[in-house]
């Protein structure tokens, strides 16, 4: 053991030891309790950032802690390798995304290994490998067979210059981020997964997720968006057709003054053929983004279609408007407008001089100026004929029943959740295993022809879909009739890859089936760690896919992740680290200067995992100083501990002196609190406990046999507490101080109940019920000793001067009251 702390050397030695001994490679073992710890897999950008390091350090602390607790721990790592960022990087560098991606993976794998994470690298997966996406294609075919994968027209953001679909974040001020062209709303044929078939189960099973943050549960509940409402039929004034409207407020039905339909509604398109003004309006609507948030905040605009519908109760004629705020994807693309009781309808009605008809008044009877603002709360019905003077809740049921009995409507449970559109008009993604044949139509690729390989030598230009230009890919033969046919050139949304990867880690070497029985052993994941930004999309899709895999008989649980931790961001100068802000701190430079253990210790100590972490250079220095202090202390006690650790009776040492028992009690109290905090994932306070223990031990001397044994016990506790957080130094010191074996093979320390027993009590001394002093006595002291100690207390003696004692009352373990 060197006198000075040399992190680069000891970290290299520890990592070589773990690799040579395959320390973190695990096998299924039914005799042991399993623990599956997983951090969200990264996109291989080429460089780890501090957000990565924090996420993975938290996960590693949890995994290593569970190893110490004797569990069979799986902690894997892989790469979310498909997607737009890689394609864009390839366009800029004029090279194939495959080359760029694999180079980055190699670099990032090395960086992760330098941090000493306890990953089972034998299970590494890369989502752009055909051995992975082959099974994703197989899964798509199973969904297609079950009717859960289907194709329909959908509205997208279309870049007319690059001839491609854009994500909302790729649009800047209404223009394509690369081409600068004005983005259009375009309807194209897209593949969807029928997540809506699982809406009710996805909502209900949120109640099972007892160890998820409430914020995430609420976000998912709102996203699924269950509501109880009524479907109402509005017949068109002319012809047999009708418009169906979904509403959660049938109590406002008598206040409808117009209907609004989406620009993409078939009726709007039909009217555009007969009106240039309507056609121009629809064209204008195409030049807006498709994101719901954007549509909600844009200026409300519309045009009269010239058509009328008939009110189902009053039989009044209602004008039908085409409005830019109505979403075709929501319900039926038709809204019943009640301007007096809906803010958006109110704004639109005032703009286009449409009538307001109040039908709800405040329940408390106070006046409301409906011209100034819509009254949106429940209340009492007015101007509603036979439903007048009824409260909104009662009216909901009465009007719903009336509509049903008269064939004009029906109750319906509605979900805000829409089917998952997985088509991407991009190159760098999983090919959708579908063939189009002029004779046979849409034909799924036979399973024995999987995988449909993505050509990896393409250099994308950013114009259109490269697969449409690659004849060797899209030209094929129909598997049914053997005539010339074409492949689907859309690729899958990368959220598909990340929706089932956690299960594939269980059996990445399996080439006969998607998942084998090992998946049932390891899933569900016991602890999942990732950012709150994935609360809805990724986590919801993974929950959906888990239920699909369960229904296919591949898994036997309902949910993918038992416990979820959403770690906070890493900030510097109060802002999230980013290259554009110039506030990035690179992990590599810190590891080189201080070592990986210092980086890990700072990240764990600086803040609780779920809170944001403010970067501090002085905090990093402080972590480094602590590890140097620990090293220096260990070097000083090395010879004494090596000698003690060779003794057979070292673990049965009895401390007799009160001061030694008190010191041992302090150490075990720190351990007790650390164990509580470890279970609560409050790792920063575990570090505080370790620092307290070291400060206690430093005051002791190895020249005293009792204190030397205290140092040995305390150091053994300290190193194991630190082992998940700073594994390299803990590994090295454990062996250098003669504790024997691998520290990871030793059980997690537990406080000795005897050590926690208090040896002395503090008792209150009263004279005639008034506090006059405090005394310390042994816990088992006799009544006589307690009385004698109390009567000899200095302040008590002063108050007893010239007084006659009538009696002394001793309340065991609490107080002494002297009556004078």
Curated annotation (Swiss-Prot):
It catalyses: tRNA(Leu) + L-leucine + ATP = L-leucyl-tRNA(Leu) + AMP + diphosphate. InterPro entries: aa-tRNA-synth_I_CS, aa-tRNA-synth_Ia, Leu-tRNA-ligase, Leu_tRNA-synth_edit, M/V/L/I-tRNA-synth_anticd-bd, Methionyl/Leucyl_tRNA_Synth, Rossmann-like_a/b/a_fold, tRNAsynth_Ia_anticodon-bd. It is an enzyme of class 6 (ligase). The keyword Nucleotide-binding applies. It is found in: Cytoplasm. A motif ('HIGH' region) lies at residues 42-52. GO terms for cellular component: cytosol. This is Leucine--tRNA ligase. The gene is leuS.
């Amino acid at each position: 053991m060197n006198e000075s702390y040399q992190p680069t050397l000891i970290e290299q030695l520890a990592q070589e030891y773990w690799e040579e001994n395959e320390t973190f490679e695990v096998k299924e073992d039914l005799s042991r309790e399993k623990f599956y710890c997983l951090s969200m897999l990264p996109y291989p950008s080429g460089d780890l950032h501090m957000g990565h390091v924090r996420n993975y350090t938290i996960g590693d602390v949890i995994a290593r802690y569970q190893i110490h607790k004797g569990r069979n721990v799986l902690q894997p790592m892989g790469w979310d390798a498909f997607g737009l960022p890689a394609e864009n990087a390839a366009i800029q560098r004029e090279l194939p995304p495959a080359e760029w991606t694999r180079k980055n993976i190699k670099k990032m794998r090395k960086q992760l290994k330098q941090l000493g994470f306890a990953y089972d690298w034998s299970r590494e997966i890369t989502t752009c490998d055909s051995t992975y996406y082959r099974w994703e294609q197989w899964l798509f075919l199973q969904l297609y067979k079950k009717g859960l994968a289907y194709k329909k027209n959908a509205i997208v953001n279309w870049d007319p210059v690059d001839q491609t679909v854009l994500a909302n974040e790729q649009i800047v001020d209404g223009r394509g981020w690369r081409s600068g062209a004005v983005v259009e709303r375009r309807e194209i044929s897209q593949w969807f997964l029928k997540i809506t078939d699982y809406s009710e189960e996805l909502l209900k099973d949120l109640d099972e997720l007892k160890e998820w943050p409430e914020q995430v549960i609420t976000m998912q509940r709102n996203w699924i968006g269950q509501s109880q409402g009524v479907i109402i039929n509005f017949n068109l004034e002319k012809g047999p057709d009708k418009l169906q409207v979904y509403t959660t407020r049938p109590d406002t039905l008598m206040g409808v003054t117009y209907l609004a339909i989406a620009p993409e509604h078939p009726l709007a398109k039909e009217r555009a053929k007969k009106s240039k003004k309507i056609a121009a309006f629809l064209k204008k609507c195409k030049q807006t983004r498709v994101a719901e948030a954007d549509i909600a905040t844009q200026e409300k605009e519309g045009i009269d279609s010239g058509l009328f519908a008939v009110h189902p109760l009053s039989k009044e004629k209602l004008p039908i408007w085409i409005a830019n705020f109505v979403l075709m994807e929501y319900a039926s693309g038709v809204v019943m407008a009640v301007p007096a009781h809906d803010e958006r309808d109110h704004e639109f009605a005032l703009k286009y001089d449409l009538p307001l008809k109040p039908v709800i008044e405040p329940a408390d009877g106070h006046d409301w100026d409906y011209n100034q603002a819509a009254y949106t709360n429940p209340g009492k019905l007015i101007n509603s004929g036979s439903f007048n003077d009824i409260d909104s809740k009662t009216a909901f049921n009465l009007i719903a029943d009336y509509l049903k009995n008269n064939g004009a409507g029906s109750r319906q449970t509605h979900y805000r959740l829409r089917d998952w559109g997985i088509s991407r008009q991009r190159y760098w993604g999983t090919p959708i295993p579908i063939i189009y044949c002029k004779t046979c139509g849409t034909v799924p690729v036979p399973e024995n022809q999987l995988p449909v390989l993505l050509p990896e030598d393409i250099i994308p230009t950013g114009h259109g879909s490269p697969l449409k230009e690659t004849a060797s890919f899209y030209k094929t033969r129909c598997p049914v009739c053997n005539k010339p046919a074409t492949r689907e050139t859309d690729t899958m949304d990368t959220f598909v890859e990340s929706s089932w990867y956690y299960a594939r880690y269980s059996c990445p070497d399996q080439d006969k089936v998607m998942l084998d029985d090992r998946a049932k052993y390891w899933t569900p994941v016991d602890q999942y760690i990732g950012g709150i930004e994935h609360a809805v999309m990724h986590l919801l899709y993974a929950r959906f896919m888990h239920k699909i895999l369960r229904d296919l008989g591949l898994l036997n649980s309902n949910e993918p992740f038992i416990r979820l931790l959403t770690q906070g961001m890493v900030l510097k100068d109060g802002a999230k680290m980013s290259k554009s802000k110039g506030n990035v701190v690179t992990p590599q430079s810190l590891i080189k200067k201080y070592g990986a253990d210092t980086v890990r210790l700072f990240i764990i100590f600086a803040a609780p995992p779920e809170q944001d972490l403010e970067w501090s250079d002085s905090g990093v220095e402080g972590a480094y100083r602590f590890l140097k202090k620990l090293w220096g202390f260990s070097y000083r006690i090395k010879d004494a501990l090596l000698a003690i650790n060779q003794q057979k009776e070292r673990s049965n040492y009895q401390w007799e002196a009160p001061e030694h028992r008190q010191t041992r009690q302090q150490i075990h109290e720190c351990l007790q609190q650390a164990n509580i905090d470890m279970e609560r994932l409050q790792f920063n306070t575990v570090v505080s406990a370790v620092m307290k223990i070291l400060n206690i031990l430093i005051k002791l001397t190895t020249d005293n046999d009792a204190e030397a044994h205290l140092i040995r016990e305390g150091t053994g506790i300290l190193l194991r507490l630190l082992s998940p957080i700073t594994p390299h130094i803990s590994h090295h010191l454990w062996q250098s101080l003669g504790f024997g074996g691998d520290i990871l093979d030793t059980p997690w320390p537990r406080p000795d109940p005897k050590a926690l027993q208090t040896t002395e009590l503090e008792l209150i001394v009263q004279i005639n019920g008034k506090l006059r002093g405090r005394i310390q006595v042994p816990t088992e002291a006799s009544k006589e000793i307690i009385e004698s100690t109390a009567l000899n207390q200095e302040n008590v003696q002063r108050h007893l001067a010239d007084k006659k004692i009538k009696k002394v009352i001793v309340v065991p373990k609490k107080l002494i009251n002297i009556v004078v």
